[in-house]
């Protein structure tokens, strides 16, 4: 009996400019076959659509954006604490709360777990999921009119599991 069960793919926990999520089916035939490579190396991880799609057994991921890389490290090492913070944000979600979180993020006085939670919240609730900073290095994307913010607990836990086998570097 052939049930043809497909494994559910892990979705990126962030939206990022240049993301490949929409193109994965088109690119599928171009990806290396599982087992045909020893290590996956991604120098510009962004949202990580290809990385999460391939779920490599061994990987090195990197990016120039330090906050992005720190968020990946937090998802890898502290997913439950991160989810707990994001659940609190879920309950407080509003334009005013978004602006408060954005100000705190820009003040650059947060510990790594709070900084990652702020980045994920801002990314999921800002206009078009953009990451943009001004000349002072401050995140300045406006609120995206999202009526609701929902934490993807299962997605973060699944991403954490894949990231456990991954070396994460800031370049």
Q: Where are the model-predicted features located?
A:
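Conserved S-adenosyl-L-methionine
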Residues: 36-91
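SAM-dependent nucleic-acid methyltransferase catalytic core
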Residues: 2-24, 29-34, 78-171
């Amino acid at each position: 009996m052939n049930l043809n069960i497909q494994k559910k793919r892990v979705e990126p926990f962030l939206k990022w400019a240049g993301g490949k999520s929409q193109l994965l089916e088109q690119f599928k035939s171009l990806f290396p076959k599982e087992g045909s490579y020893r290590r996956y190396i991604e120098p510009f991880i962004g949202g990580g659509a290809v990385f999460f799609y391939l779920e490599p057994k061994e990987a090195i991921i990197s990016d120039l954006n330090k906050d992005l890389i720190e968020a990946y490290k937090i998802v890898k090492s502290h997913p439950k604490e991160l989810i707990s913070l994001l659940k609190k944000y879920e309950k407080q979600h509003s334009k005013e709360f978004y602006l408060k979180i954005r100000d705190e993020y820009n003040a650059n006085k947060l510990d790594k777990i709070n900084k990652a939670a702020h980045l994920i919240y801002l990314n999921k609730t800002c206009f078009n999921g953009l990451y943009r900073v001004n000349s002072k290095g401050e995140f300045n994307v406006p609120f995206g009119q999202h009526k609701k913010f929902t934490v993807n607990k299962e997605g973060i836990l699944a991403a954490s599991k894949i990231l456990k086998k991954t070396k994460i570097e800031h370049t």
